[in-house]
Amino acid sequence: MSFILALDQGTTSSRALVFDHDGTVRGLAQKEFRQIFPEPGLVEHDAEEIWASQLGVAVEAVARAGLSAADIAAIGITNQRETTVVWDRRTGKPIHNAIVWQDRRTAAECDRLKRLGLEATFRARTGLVLDPYFSGTKLAWLLDHLPGARDKAERGELAFGTIDSWLVWNLTGGERHLTDASNASRTLLFNIHEGNWDQELLQLLRIPPAILPEVVPSSQVYGETAARFFAARVPISGIAGDQQAALFGQLCDRPGMVKNTYGTGCFMLMQTGERPVLSERNLLTTVACRLGERTEYALEGSVFAAGAAVQWLRDGLGIIRSSEEVETLAATVPDNGGVYLVPAFAGLGAPHWDPYARGTLLGITRGSTAGHIARATLESIAFQTADLLEAMEADAATPLTELRVDGGATANNLLMQFQADLLGVPVVRPRVRETTALGAAYLAGLAIGYWQDRKELSRLWQAEQAFAPVLERERMAELRYNWNRAVERSKGWAQP
């Protein structure tokens, strides 16, 4: 019997999971790594530490499963997106720390491009907004600020990649410099309609084409691991950015199917099939995956503070000792008692995109308790999700029939039930909650025939629990109305 190894390289830790043919986790290892904050607004990672931690957990996960490298049929990779690495092709060494997706150092450059009237051009071609979040301006910053970097890039001596590219380069001993289409679509440099690097956008950001990786399908044998890393050379055959991998792992393979990942923030993706839907409501259009010549697309929206709001209750207010306690505390009251929290600690994401919004707690009376604040915090996660979903349904002209969910906060039954009540459709939690890693495993396995097709995969997907809506729609409409009032009060608070 053989197995698939999924490498799940995240923002705070590197993980590796071994899956069997039924999609069951047989081995898991995880290692955190340093977060580097040179100054406010700047976030970096040591790319070599990322590689070392990822290789270490890969070996450990296989050992914990009681297996050897000879038992691994293929490797799939999923990764934190947008985080930018540039390295020297000859030495294989990064020329600077990785600039993380959270980093805001290129805000002024994005503003400059907007003033030049270029946002519509970037949006139409890439499906993205001009924001420091994405890789393109990070890469331009590195070339502009590191002595000699631009000259080396022009001579083809440097390589750029998101984390998937960096891992593949190292796993193959420097033989392959590539990225999959889902990761390429997060760079601000990739034309999602033509499926290639956009030459005009490269010129606008002064990016030499020689520095870019080859763009490949999300499921294909790209190469094998170098012999020195494992006792056997293992095919690398699947890559997707973390949120696209979760969409694939949730088997959202038909237009209109939606998944929401509840983590520090929330990431919602709606599968739109082979049709890229350009949003009129501030959502992102992204490549979901490329399978052979077929490219599938998704609408995406993000919530900046979901689990982070619960962490604030723990670390900022001290009204809970662990994040798990929030459900118990929230259940001490029958409803929110008129209390609303807008957790805009770092502004508001889609569909509002207001960087100047700030956290707002409204409706407090002498009768308000810690339970009301805890409940308002959980409800804020569901409200923000509902805002995203409403925008997606309108953009895609496709009504939702169910929401598939994953991520740590889905263990909170009170939140999941309120989410179902608010949306008016079932919220479905899968049996296997490691959907991001599972998506990478599925992509890798399909490429080598470990699984034959998506029909076979769909038979593996099982719901652990479905939360059906039970509260009246009129009551939900009233809560949404008050939530919208609270959001409007939070907007623009930090405007200079």
From Swiss-Prot:
Catalytic activity: glycerol + ATP = sn-glycerol 3-phosphate + ADP + H(+)
Binding site for sn-glycerol 3-phosphate: T11, R81, E82, Y133, D242
Activity modulation: Inhibited by fructose 1,6-bisphosphate (FBP).
Keywords: ATP-binding, Glycerol metabolism, Kinase, Nucleotide-binding, Transferase
Residues where ADP binds: T11, R15, T264, G307, G408, N412
Sample GO molecular function, one term: glycerol kinase activity
Annotated positions binding glycerol: R81, E82, Y133, D242, Q243
Domain of life: Bacteria
InterPro entries from the UniProt entry: ATPase_NBD, Carb_kinase_FGGY, Carb_kinase_FGGY_CS, FGGY_C, FGGY_N, Glycerol_kin
SUPFAM superfamilies linked to this entry: Actin-like ATPase domain
Ligand binding (ATP): T11, T12, S13, T264, G307, Q311, G408
Primary role: Key enzyme in the regulation of glycerol uptake and metabolism. Catalyzes the phosphorylation of glycerol to yield sn-glycerol 3-phosphate.
Protein known as: Glycerol kinase
Organism: Trichlorobacter lovleyi (strain ATCC BAA-1151 / DSM 17278 / SZ)
Gene from which this protein is expressed: glpK
